[in-house]
Amino acid sequence: MNGFGRLEHFSGAVYEGQFKDNMFHGLGTYTFPNGAKYTGNFNENRVEGEGEYTDIQGLEWSGNFHFTAAPDLKLKLHM
């Protein structure tokens, strides 16, 4: 698949965004089965670059993501 699309996994995870060669690649949103969500850049199925992560408590974190590492994330405060 190439271009924009949506993939629903049997686990409950959902990816909606850009695909390249059947991989998450470009801008997209990945919703985890537990309800947490990442929105941002993907590179060959891996989170890579600027993005936002919303955890299961609704806290929003933003910053640079590099596959399994996300140094210097910033918590967004809503007042």
Swiss-Prot record:
PANTHER family: MORN REPEAT-CONTAINING PROTEIN 2. It holds the Pfam family MORN. It is found in: Cytoplasmic vesicle, Secretory vesicle, Acrosome; Nucleus. Disulfide bonds: none annotated. Might have a role in spermatogenesis. MORN repeats lie at residues 15-36, 38-55. This is MORN repeat-containing protein 2. The keyword Repeat applies. GO terms for cellular component: acrosomal vesicle; nucleus. It comes from Homo sapiens (Human). GO terms for biological process: cell differentiation; spermatogenesis. It comes from the Eukaryota. Keywords: Cytoplasmic vesicle, Differentiation, Nucleus, Repeat, Spermatogenesis. The keyword Repeat applies.
